[in-house]
């Protein structure tokens, strides 16, 4: 999730350092309680650390039994951060997931390639944020939003992202980068083009996560780079629906935030016709685990 809203008591307990980026203030300089970017990540980790490792595993087991198995899902991509930060917890987690009734494909969503290699993992990221989301109006766009000022935020410079992606190519690590808006996806494409020019011939099925607003040129470049696009079909149902009341909880977020650009959100047909592999998922728990709804 790209934003958190906390009250004054929560701010006091979490103790978010004021030096972190993303603490929203009003026109008088008073903290509003809305946290984004670094402050949001700090708050989420602080809250998760209130639970023991065993409590977290118990919640995972319950979620699988109650929400995932009833939907017929047999494989889950798990994108983890705080749960496996300590190497001892990572080893315990590997043993834990072997006992679960579903297959778990584990991603560690950090930017430290040395740590990934030390753990002998073959992939990293999955939710390394290049930008935010349309819901929070911080997905990075080339043109301004329709309903608010600004065109979103990029969380890396191009040089920083180039360096990270190149490190993955050189270490034969698959990387998944979260890029919702067209400006963010442009950064991802440029980083892969930079890395492939230096390390040609690598084919690790690198992932572009979400890819909700692309241009036709970007689709063609993604194909040339052999990127897999990890997308969420149900987003179009819940966020791009213009028939109010068709599904519970649906809205017109794409229309409201993007205007006419909503006509090129989630271009599944064009992406498939270009020969790109789409990995369709739910982005749970943002949307329910329900493959048939996505189909």
PLM feature segments, named:
Residues 1-111, 135-167, 171-180, 184, ...:
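Divalent metal-binding segments
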Residues 7, 72, 132, 178, ...:
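Divalent metal-coordination and catalytic microenvironments
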Residues 8, 88-90, 185-193, 239-247, ...:
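Histidine/acidic-residue-rich catalytic or RNA/ligand-binding cores of hydrolases
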Residues 76-77, 104-109, 122-130, 175-177, ...:
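Hydrophobic faces of well-ordered beta-strands that scaffold small-molecule active sites
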Residues 96-97, 115-119, 166, 199-201, ...:
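Acidic (Asp/Glu)-rich catalytic clusters
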Residues 119-123, 193, 221-230, 274-277:
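Glycine-enriched alpha-helix->loop->beta-strand junction motifs that scaffold or abut catalytic
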Residues 197-266, 271, 291:
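C-terminal active-site-proximal or functional interface alpha/beta core segments in diverse enzymes
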